[in-house]
Amino acid sequence: MTTYLVPCGLSILNWMRAYSSGDPNKRYANIDPAAVEDLLDEQEQWRSNEKRELNVWKSTVLEKARAADVEHWDPRVSAETSTLRARRPGGPLITDEDRIVLLASDTDEGISAALCVAAVVAAGNPGRIDGIAEPEDELPPGKATVVRIDGLKPTSLSLGRACEAMGTVLHNALATGPSERIEVHLTGGYKAALLHMLAMTEVAYSRFPSRVSAHYIFEGDGRSATGHDKAVRIGLRRFPRGQLIRMREELSYAKRGLPMRGTPMFEGLAWEKYGDRTRLTDFGRGYLAVLGGTWTPGTNDGGGL
């Protein structure tokens, strides 16, 4: 079983708009532009509805996706499907042995884009689309799940909440089983968050180096994704186990505002002094989530370390 964590941006919506308007550079397949335009219109109507129920989306937007022959769309329609196809050059993008988790920004357009990516990943099959989940929710196998990342939006003053949410998703993915692999794909998504996601992936990799990997593909090289653009594996740094234990302890003290024990190792990197108090940086909030959350002194809660 492999869990694919894929930060999701707006590239698929941008492609659909360009394709439906007749942009010759976006003609990756013989699809009726009018059908793509109908799909866009249906997605916009669903997005403007206050309830935005998933069952309604499946019965309206997904039906339009099938009418637009989404099953045969070239993976280049989005950064997310391009990177998945590069890692899965043959067969369907998702099987019973996979979990595909699309990390969506905290905006209506971000959710819309992620659901459209899910439609392509699932080849229009509603049974392969789990729905819109919270970071702490269980990740079902054999399905594409959209996770809305709280605070991941242009109006946010920091990425602290978003890092904590993404770290929680990573922690839950690690908890799925001792033999299950986790691939983090960093080709698409909200650019400001990719660096934070990479840093958190290094903490996850430090915990389970045989299970965790990160990948990306170069954009705009002009080759067909159906010809299998090469997915490049990112070399990840690794913290020794003792440093991970110390990191969780130190960040827990900083979050609670308690005096540090011993010489600080992660001041400036994951926490900082703020007047006479301490607070976690955005990176620190993500690190602590990956490590299992706040550690309580005097307990044997190891967070799986």
Task: Please place each PLM-identified region on the residue numbering.
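Polyanion-engaging groove/track-forming segments
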Residues: 191
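Long, low-complexity, Lys/Arg-enriched
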Residues: 1-183, 195-305
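A short helix-loop-helix "switch/interaction" segment in the helical subdomain of ASCE P-loop NTPases
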Residues: 185-187
